[in-house]
């Protein structure tokens, strides 16, 4: 009875949390009035936090995630595993009591790595750990045997272009942060091919390594020959750099069975809590369901997808119904360049004026430190007030750069966007590697992440007005 009374009070607080004043259809509210409206959500926010972090549903997102990734495993674009996961999630969301659960068809790339190996033949025999990069071609039958040229940058490759023809280029670039260093993974094959190389091997884009290669997407360029490309461990890249500096001749035999097949059908997975007053207006909450084909895809991006599901579950379990529709989208084929999100945008952009906020969790679900946000100054000021509701968790900061692969389409068109900001210290230890498993995940940290995500999504969806764009 006490819990029912508490939920009744939560309902009253939600419904009576503010009243807009309009003149000629244009809001005349002061920021002070908006601030007071948001402050009235304090008890609702505490109810969400208590349920997610301390209450009946603590650890639920972790347990749900573990069941999926232990059952299905990794979920590469075009794979049977991904489609199995999508069907499981479709059933899960229906069983959870969410509304308008449906699948939206998407055409996605289908690439498979096949068998792959690399062996150093000179100056000594050494079997190397490699992971072919997404969309890479395979080697010819029997593989490639070639001498190695080690470079530390694209500039060095250009300076030594006369030495590169017929060689395997090994990039031993220093790690200077993911955003800067990832260019070698994405463009390494193209730049090597331009100077006549027969293959490229790139030091894994990782902040720490225990002899672990890390995969990811790479992109060919029209008019440039396609050559096989893979990532190698930090340890092997650095070793070959040392060997080269001593004047050693390095020879590698590389075999890659990678193949690209015709595009295939997949689906974005959608579920909602329909808005009570403005059902056509939307706060979108998202993560991607696909992963690479190594590890379990728990970190990237199982955690983000499942705290996004949990956000809607928590709102539903408290009996809350926001004024606007809360829409969950689990993207497909994010790792291939946001394919599912791109097609979703094309399908729904006619309603762009109805999107108040687009949210994406795709940077891990370690302990949150705040929210990254992109939007107008007025919208940022409002988001700072919303984040103040999370003082019980000490997660109140609003950072810049709310962009994410799957929501950038909307942000570039002027829709406010937010990404979860958390402690990334360990993220790139495991990112796109065999180490991306449930062992990396922490249920208590996921609880906090889910609470943050749910509070932000619900409050923005329930406020009297959409977030301002200018």
Curated annotation (Swiss-Prot):
Residues 19-42 form a propeptide. It comes from Mus musculus. It comes from the Eukaryota. Homodimer. The monomeric form is inactive while the homodimer is active. Keywords: Carboxypeptidase, Endoplasmic reticulum, Glycoprotein, Golgi apparatus, Hydrolase, Lysosome, Metal-binding, Metalloprotease, Protease, Secreted, Signal, Zinc, Zymogen. The keyword Repeat does not apply. Carboxypeptidase that may play an important role in the hydrolysis of circulating peptides. Catalyzes the hydrolysis of dipeptides with unsubstituted terminals into amino acids. May play a role in the liberation of thyroxine hormone from its thyroglobulin (Tg) precursor. The gene is Cpq. This is Carboxypeptidase Q. The lineage of its organism: Eukaryota, Metazoa, Chordata, Craniata, Vertebrata.
């Amino acid at each position: 009875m006490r819990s029912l009374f508490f939920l009744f009070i939560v309902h009253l607080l939600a419904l009576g949390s503010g009243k807009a004043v309009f003149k000629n259809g244009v809001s005349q509210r002061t920021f002070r009035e908006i601030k007071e409206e948001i402050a009235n959500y304090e008890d609702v926010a505490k109810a969400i936090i208590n349920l997610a972090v301390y209450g009946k549903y603590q650890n639920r997102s972790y347990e749900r995630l573990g069941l999926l990734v232990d059952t299905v495993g990794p979920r590469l674009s075009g794979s049977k595993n991904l489609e199995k996961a999508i069907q499981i999630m479709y059933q899960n969301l229906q069983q959870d009591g969410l509304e308008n659960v449906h699948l939206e068809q998407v055409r996605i790339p289908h690439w498979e790595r096949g068998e792959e190996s690399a062996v150093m033949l000179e100056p000594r025999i050494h079997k190397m750990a490699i992971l072919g990069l997404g969309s890479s071609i395979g080697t010819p039958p029997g593989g490639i045997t070639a001498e190695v040229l080690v470079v530390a940058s694209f500039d060095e490759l250009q300076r030594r272009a006369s030495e590169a023809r017929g060689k395997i280029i090994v990039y031993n670039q220093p790690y200077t942060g993911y955003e800067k260093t990832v260019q070698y993974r994405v463009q390494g094959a193209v730049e090597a091919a331009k100077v006549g190389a027969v293959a490229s091997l790139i030091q894994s884009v990782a902040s720490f390594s225990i002899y672990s290669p890390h995969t990811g997407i790479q992109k060919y360029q029209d008019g440039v020959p396609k050559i096989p490309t893979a990532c190698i461990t930090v340890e092997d890249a650095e070793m070959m750099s040392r060997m080269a500096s001593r004047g050693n001749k390095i020879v590698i035999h590389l075999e890659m069975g990678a193949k690209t097949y015709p595009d295939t059908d997949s689906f974005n997975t959608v579920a909602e809590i329909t808005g009570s007053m403005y059902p056509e207006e939307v706060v979108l909450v998202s993560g991607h369901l696909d992963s690479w084909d190594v590890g379990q895809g728990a970190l990237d991006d199982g955690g983000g997808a499942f705290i996004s599901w949990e956000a809607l579950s928590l709102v539903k379990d408290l009996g809350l119904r926001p004024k606007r529709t809360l829409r969950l989208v689990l993207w497909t084929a994010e790792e291939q360049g946001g394919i599912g999100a791109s097609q979703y945008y094309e399908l729904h952009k006619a309603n762009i004026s109805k999107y108040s906020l687009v949210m994406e969790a795709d940077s891990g679900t370690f302990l949150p430190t705040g929210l990254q946000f992109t939007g107008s100054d007025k919208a940022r000021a409002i988001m700072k007030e919303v984040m103040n509701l999370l003082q019980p968790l000490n997660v109140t900061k609003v950072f810049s750069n709310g962009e994410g692969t799957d929501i950038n389409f909307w942000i570039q068109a002027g829709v406010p966007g937010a990404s979860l900001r958390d402690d990334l210290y360990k993220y790139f230890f495991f990112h796109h590697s065999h180490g991306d498993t449930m062992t990396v995940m922490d249920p208590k940290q996921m609880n906090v992440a889910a609470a943050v995500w749910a509070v932000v999504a619900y409050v923005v969806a329930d406020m009297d007005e959409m977030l301002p764009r200018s």
